[in-house]
Amino acid sequence: MSTDSILTTVPIQWLSVDSPVLPDEVLDWLMELGSMTRRFEQYCNSVRIIPFRECFITEEQLSDENERLLTGQRYWLREIVLCGDNIPWLLGRTLIPETTLTGPDESLVDLGTVPLGRYLFSGNKLTRDYIHVGQQGNRWARRSLLRLSGKPLLLTEVFLPESPVYKR
């Protein structure tokens, strides 16, 4: 199995929310507090998930993400491509500490082609600590520390050029 990440081709430069390079219409997307899947569904007939990588990884395999999560354990890694009407719109990378995968949340390792947002936003046990916004080359990105029943997971999303984020 490859150890390459779907997001590692160009590093993400994390920015301040009030950075002058952030257009208001893009910031509106990046600061979305609800389900990005639901928002994308407003711009297409169907959303589809293509799994890229799903496996457990160790702390040593993390980049700067390790400072955002609990240390000293394994993490469930899920990397996907989200498509709207079969056009790639988003690269997603989810890191879930093994200690988060308890009770009903164990099913997070079995999502397969189900959008993460469908699971996360189906109940009221989700909170968000923060959203960081950034750029990866000419693509916009965001990273959120979410808590599911108080337990952390880190979600990084990179918006691809055909995404409605860039439509004016």
From Swiss-Prot:
One of its GO terms (biological process) is ubiquinone biosynthetic process. It catalyses: chorismate = 4-hydroxybenzoate + pyruvate. Gene3D superfamilies: Chorismate lyase-like. Pfam families: Chor_lyase. Keywords: Cytoplasm, Lyase, Pyruvate, Ubiquinone biosynthesis. Substrate binds at residues 36, 78, 116, 157. One of its GO terms (cellular component) is cytosol. Its EC number is 4.1.3.40. Pathway: Cofactor biosynthesis; ubiquinone biosynthesis. The keyword Lyase applies. InterPro entries: Chorismate--pyruvate_lyase, Chorismate_lyase_/UTRA_dom_sf. GO terms for molecular function: chorismate lyase activity. It is found in: Cytoplasm. It comes from the Bacteria. Monomer. NCBIfam families: PRK11655.1. Removes the pyruvyl group from chorismate, with concomitant aromatization of the ring, to provide 4-hydroxybenzoate (4HB) for the ubiquinone pathway. Belongs to the UbiC family. This is Chorismate pyruvate-lyase. It comes from Photorhabdus laumondii subsp. laumondii (strain DSM 15139 / CIP 105565 / TT01). The gene is ubiC.
